[in-house]
C-alpha cells in the first residue's frame, strides 16, 4: 500500500487547548528516557563486511559469501614457526574470507572513531554460531560456537602519519561442513566507547558463481541495479516464507508484471533485485481455468538449499551449489519445472524441518481438486507425492465438490491440517478443518467452522460451544497457523479462532470483523504479527486474548512524529511496506521509502514495546489540579515494578551449546598491529581448532576429555620456554602462539535470562526463580485453619505447559514482606512418559513452557538504554529426548588398568600401536565405557546396561568384513547350537528373547572362545608369532537401559592376539616341527661321527695329488733334457734327487702334525 497508509492521520484530536498541550508534553515525556540515553551513550553501532583473503586492508570493499572450500595459503607460514608449540608438519589450511569490523557513531568520522577505540583499548569480540544442518543422517547434530578476538590491522591506503591513519579489526570467517547459516554477534571487551551488541547474518549464497571475467553473477537470473519506484510503490505486501533458522538465502516476489524477486543472504541487511531466467509460459486447459496471464512471481519459498517459486499455475525450483552440504554436482544449472501436468493455485510453506528433510506443499485446482502435492527436499533433491494416496479429501468427507484453501504440516505428528471449503447442494459454502496423517493415510474431520461470526457482546474472547448467538457477517477463513512448540492453532480470515487441542476453539473478539487477515508473521516464541488486506498491523501474544493494533494507532502517531523530528533515515512521509517478518524474536519491516523523488529500500525494526507503551499512555492518564496548574500522571497497569530472574543454572547443560575460544597470535611489534602473515596464521589456527573438533569422535576415549588436549599434550611442559622467547621477542616468524588461547569453554555463565531452548533427558529438571517487586501494597493477610494469619500476594505467576502429560512444573512462592516482593521458585521436570530412546539430537519431541505474570500481557515494560523491553511473558521451547553432544566411548585407559589388575599381567602385541592396544586371547576381557558430554566436559563411567555384539572382523585391518544378521546371531547368541560362538560370559541376564547377553560395568568379563565355526577359529599365523584377529564390536543400550533417553551406539575395533590354533593345525605344526628337529639332530650326529674320516680322506687325497703332480714334473723334465751333455744330465739328476729329498723332508713333518691333530 502507498506511503500515506503507513502514516495515518488518526482520529480527530480534541480541540481543547489543554489537551493539545498535553499531547505535545506526552511525546516529550515518552521520549525523555531516549534523550537521557543519547546524552549518556553515543548511538554507536558495529559495522561488519566480508573480505576475501587477498583483499585484507583494502578500503571500501565488500565481498559476497559463496566460496566454501578451505584454501591452502597458510601452510608455508607454519613451516617458519620452528620455536612454537605447534607441530609444523601438521596440515594447516585457511578460510576464504575475513570479517572486517568497524564501528560508527552519529556525526563522527568512522576512521577517527576506530583509531580512538583502538588507542583506548577497545577490542571487538566476535561470536560465530553455526546452525545445525537439516540432514542429521549425513551430519552430526550440534550447537557449535567459536568466540574470537579481532586483531587490529592498518589499512593499505597511503598514509602520511607515522603510525596509522585508518585501521580496522579482522577475524577469520570460519566455515564448517554441514552448516550454511551462521550468526555473527559482535560485542565489546568493555573498554573504550560503549557500543551495544549487534548480530549479523553471514550465510553462504549457493546461487552465485564467477563468470569468465572472474565477475560474480547470479545463477538464477540476471541482477538489476535500478530499483524503479513502480516496482514497489503502491504494491501490496506479501509474506516472507522460508524454513526457520535454516535458509541461507531469502527470496521475496510480488513485483507486478515482472519476473523480478528480491534476494538476500544477510536477512535484508543488503539485497539484490534479480530477474529470473524462466520461460514465463502459460498453458491453459479445461482443467486449469486461469483467466489471464501475468509475469508476477506470486509465491516464493526458501529452504536450506533450494528456492521455490510459483508463476501463474507453474511451479519451479532451483537448487544452489553447496559443497558444504552435498556433492558439487547437485546444484541446478537452470530453473526446473515440477508438477508440469498440474494446475497449482498456491504454495504453502513448512516452517520446520524434520526427519532430516524439509517440506513444501502445493495446492491444486482442476482435475486433482481435493489433493495436496507434498514435496520433500533432502540434500537438494526434490520429490513430490500426491496426498491422500487413495481417495481425495472431498470423497472422504462425503461431499461432491471441495477445495483445499490452506495446508499446515505438523512435522512431529506427521499430520496435515487442511482448511477445506465444501459445498452441500444449494446450501452456502461451509468450511472444515481436516486432519490427515501422512504415515497411516488416515483422514479425520476435526472441526466445523461456524458459518457466521459470533456475537461477543463486549467480551475479549468467547468460547465456541454452539449455543452462542451470531452476527450476520459470514466467516471467511483463509488459513491455519500452528505453533509446534505450544500446540496452539489459529484459524484466521476476517476473524481469529484459537485452540490448544484442535477441538475447542476460542473466538478472539478484539480483532474487528470488518477487516480480513492477509497473512501472519510468526515468531514461534509467543508473539504473532497480523497483516490485513488494508495493510494494517496487529499484534497478539499467544495464550492471551488481547489483540493490539500497532498500525495505524495513536502509538504509531507518536512514534513516527518523534522519528521525523530526529530526521531518521528509516522513516518517511511516503512509504510502502513490502513484507513483515520475525528475526530472532524481533519484528521487522521491509519498507520502500520515497524522499524527494528518490526511493530507498530499508529494513527497520518495528518497536512493538514502544508502540504498546505509547498507546497505553495516550489512552490512560489523569489530570490533577494542584494549585493553579494541572499535573499529568499516567496509570501503570502492570502488577509489578521490577522483574528479575534468579538462581539460573549454568546454561550449557540445557542449551547444549558448545563453544571454543580463539585469540589472535601475539605479534612482536611495538605498535601491536598485525600484518598479513600474522592474520594468515590466525586463520590456520582457527581452522585447526575446528578440525580437532570435527575429528573428536573416536571410539577410543583420550586420557583427557578435551578435543584440544592432543594439540598441546607434548608441549605443555615447555610452556615457560615459549613464554621466555615471546617475552624477549625471539619467537620465530614474528608471532607468539599461546596454548591457553585456543581452548574449549565448559563454564559459561547465565546471562540473567532464560535460555533460547532447553533440552531435557529422562527425568531431568530445570529450576530457576522469578523475583517480582509488587506495585504499591499488594499483600493481604488471611486466617486459615491452624495458623493465625497467612500472608498472600496479589502478584501471581502461572506456568502453562504445552504437553502436561510429558512434563510437569512446580511453583513455590516466598513472600518477602520487607521488600514488598515475591520470589517464585519454578522447577520444570520430565515425567519419563513420552519418549522411548533415540540417537543423540535425533527425533526430539518439541514442547514448551510459558511463564506468565497474571495481568501483565502487553502492559509491562522494562526501560533500558536500548529501548523498552516487554516483561511478564516468558516462553521457552523444550526438547525432550537424547540431548545433542552426548556419546559413548571405550574407556581404554581404565580397561587396561583393570585387566592388568585382574589378570595379574598384561601382554601387548609385538608391534605396539598406542592408538589400539592389544588384549591377550587367554585373558578375561573386562570392557569399560564412558559417557562423555561434549558440551559440559563431563566424562564418567557408563553405569547403565548394554548389549555387546561382534558385528565384523578379520585377521588384518585390510581384510575386515561385516557380518550378516544371521552370522551376528550365531557368533554372539548364547542360544547358538552351531558351535560358532566367538565369546561368552558368566552373566545370566539376557534380552527378552534370550538372544543376547545384557552386560553392565559390574559384569564378570568376557571369555574368548572362537569355536570351530567362528571366523576367528584356526587362523594361519602371519609369522613366527601366534595368530591375531581384529573384532568389530558394537555396543548399544537400546531396549535394555532405562536410565536415559539416549540410544548410545558405539562401534570400535578390538585387537586380540595370542589366538590358539586348531588341534589339527597344531598337530600338523608339531609333527612338521618334530620332523625337522629330529632331522637336524640326526644330521648333527652324523656330521660329528663322519667328520674325522672326511678330514683324513681329504688329507690322503691331497697327498696323492701332490705326489702325482711331482712325478709328472720329473718325467717331463727328463725327456726334455735327454739331448744334453752328460755333465748336464748328471748335474740334473743330482739336482732332482736333492729336490725330491727336500720335498719328502717337508712332507714328513706336515703328515706328523696332521696325525697329531686327528688324534
UniProtKB/Swiss-Prot annotation:
TM regions (residue ranges): 1066-1087
Compartments (UniProt record): Cell projection, Cilium, Flagellum membrane
GO annotation, cellular component aspect: CatSper complex; motile cilium; plasma membrane; sperm principal piece
Record bears the keyword Glycoprotein: yes
InterPro entries xref list: CATSPERG (IPR028246), CATSPERG_b-prop (IPR053871), CATSPERG_C (IPR053873), CATSPERG_Ig-like (IPR053874), CATSPERG_N (IPR053872)
Disulphide-bonded residues: 44-105, 159-165, 288-343, 394-402, 638-860, 806-834, 882-1046, 909-918, 1010-1016
Keyword line: Cell membrane, Cell projection, Cilium, Developmental protein, Differentiation, Disulfide bond, Flagellum, Glycoprotein, Membrane, Signal, Spermatogenesis, Transmembrane, Transmembrane helix
Superkingdom field: Eukaryota
Membrane topology: Single-pass type I membrane protein
BP term (GO), one: spermatogenesis
Pfam families membership: CATSPERG_beta-prop, CATSPERG_C, CATSPERG_Ig-like, CATSPERG_NTD
Chain spans, region Disordered: 1139-1159
Topological domain ranges for the Extracellular compartment: 36-1065
Signal peptide span: 1-35
Cytoplasmic side: 1088-1159
Chain positions carrying an annotated carbohydrate: 102, 355, 426, 574
Subunit structure: Component of the CatSper complex or CatSpermasome composed of the core pore-forming members CATSPER1, CATSPER2, CATSPER3 and CATSPER4 as well as auxiliary members CATSPERB, CATSPERG, CATSPERD, CATSPERE, CATSPERZ, C2CD6/CATSPERT, TMEM249, TMEM262 and EFCAB9. HSPA1 may be an additional auxiliary complex member. The core complex members CATSPER1, CATSPER2, CATSPER3 and CATSPER4 form a heterotetrameric channel.
PANTHER family: CATION CHANNEL SPERM-ASSOCIATED AUXILIARY SUBUNIT GAMMA (PTHR14327:SF1), CATION CHANNEL SPERM-ASSOCIATED PROTEIN SUBUNIT GAMMA (PTHR14327)
Function: Auxiliary component of the CatSper complex, a complex involved in sperm cell hyperactivation. Sperm cell hyperactivation is needed for sperm motility which is essential late in the preparation of sperm for fertilization.
Family statement drawn from the similarity comment of this UniProt entry: Belongs to the CATSPERG family.
Protein name per UniProt: Cation channel sperm-associated auxiliary subunit gamma
Gene source species: Homo sapiens
Classification of source organism: Eukaryota, Metazoa, Chordata, Craniata, Vertebrata
